[in-house]
Amino acid sequence: MLPQEVENILDVVIRHNTWRRKETINLIASENVMSPLAELVYINDLAGRYAEGIVGSRYYQGVRYVDILEDALSKKFANVLGARFVDVRPISGTIANLAAYFALVPEGGTVASLPIKYGGHISHNTVGGLKALRLKAVELPWDLENFNIDVDAARKLIEEKRPNLIILGASLYLFPHPVKEIAEVAKTVGAYVLHDSAHVFGLIVGGAFPNPLREGAHLTTASTHKTFPGPQGGVIATVLDEEKNSQIQRAVFPTFTSNYHLHRYAATYVTLVEMEVFGREYATRIVENARALAEALAAEGVPPVAERQGYTKTHQVAVDVSKFGGGDKVAALLEEANIIVNKNALPWDKSVLKPSGIRIGVQEMTRFGMGKDEMREIARFIARVLRGEDVNNIKRDVVEFRKSYLEIKYGFKISRDIVDKIFHSLNLYT
């Protein structure tokens, strides 16, 4: 028998699995689920191993298979993205960003980026990694009418402030940023352009969003677990020269990481192949579903932002819920009905700590096979909550609704033979 405290922890895990995997409508824009095969191969001996260094030059022995996995994954990403260099060792998108900043921006240098209220990620701002690296930040100007970077004002800012690095991409990201236009002015001041593709990485790989490396960015960073539905991890892809790529490598290790969470490599590779096979359909459906959900919410009297632009061209929908009590209140109320979203600041908010909005992402529910009709049903659930209907009644309806959407699509299945091979290799069968 297991100790009771262990049984208690196992029970928590099982209850969480059941709740989030089977009973909730998961609309967090930064999350997703792996395919059955990717989730299975995520369980491997590499979870407890180290491989400091780079392929072919390690500080540890016993890494022959690590080198095969890391080399294969890096080369495959490079081929898919059209990159000269890829580093898959960062353990998150934020670590990938920090390594890029450290390699490309001198101490005391300047970074131009979007503030949080305009969608910028914490790692793009002095509240996050920029402060730790003693870098200065200047805010890219925002065009509220077009819900995007103000190109003309940004051009003037870049020419005046002459930043070392310009960060595009965002945490709240509804429309592609003007990479080409910013890259052109960056060239005149010698600035690097980094596109943080964390949120839209799967859309890029699936061809539903512009590839920033082909639009003029010098490098892109990403996480591998949002619209790209793999395990949590990070990646850096560049079109830079060998010297700069080597600086990035040295920033990843030994500066910011020692262990690269090697057990994710195989699952990430499986996911990348899945995106080659299913990604175009999956990415297209994600964008279609986001637009359908936005239109349905508007019809229900819960209007998303950016109506003039068609609401969204990504997986995200942003809704101003100030008239319903604000982002904090609405996100908590929706969770009571088993609808999971996050509060989010909007450009007109005076404080990001008291946001007027919520952010919604459809990538996970799309992977469970939902389409436009289901998006309209989700909009009705959300509207019912905001109109004050008993959340317990809505919760029961949500749980019943999810029963029809439990199978993960756009990925590889598993067989008993594969399960046996993995478990026997780990000696998990007794």
Curated annotation (Swiss-Prot):
Modification N6-(pyridoxal phosphate)lysine, positions = 226
Primary localisation category: cytoplasm
Q: Which amino acids does the record list as binding (6S)-5,6,7,8-tetrahydrofolate?
A: 120-122
Localisation per UniProt entry: Cytoplasm
Which key words are in the record?
Answer: Amino-acid biosynthesis, Cytoplasm, One-carbon metabolism, Pyridoxal phosphate, Transferase
Which residue windows are coiled coil? Answer: none
Q: Where is this site: Plays an important role in substrate specificity?
A: 225
The superkingdom of the source organism is Archaea
Family listed: Belongs to the SHMT family.
* Gene3D superfamilies associated with the record: Aspartate Aminotransferase, domain 1, Type I PLP-dependent aspartate aminotransferase-like (Major domain)
Q: List the disulfide bonds.
A: none
Example GO molecular function = pyridoxal phosphate binding
Cofactor(s) needed, names only, are: pyridoxal 5'-phosphate
Q: How does it assemble?
A: Homodimer.
One Gene Ontology term from the biological process aspect of the record: tetrahydrofolate interconversion
One GO cellular component term of this record is:
cytoplasm
Query: Mind telling me what this protein is named?
Result: Serine hydroxymethyltransferase
Q: What is its EC number?
A: 2.1.2.-
Q: ATP-binding as a keyword?
A: no
Q: Which PANTHER family does this UniProt record tie to the protein?
A: SERINE HYDROXYMETHYLTRANSFERASE, SERINE HYDROXYMETHYLTRANSFERASE 1
Function text: Catalyzes the reversible interconversion of serine and glycine with a modified folate serving as the one-carbon carrier. Also exhibits a pteridine-independent aldolase activity toward beta-hydroxyamino acids, producing glycine and aldehydes, via a retro-aldol mechanism.
| Pathway(s) where this gene product acts | Amino-acid biosynthesis; glycine biosynthesis; glycine from L-serine: step 1/1
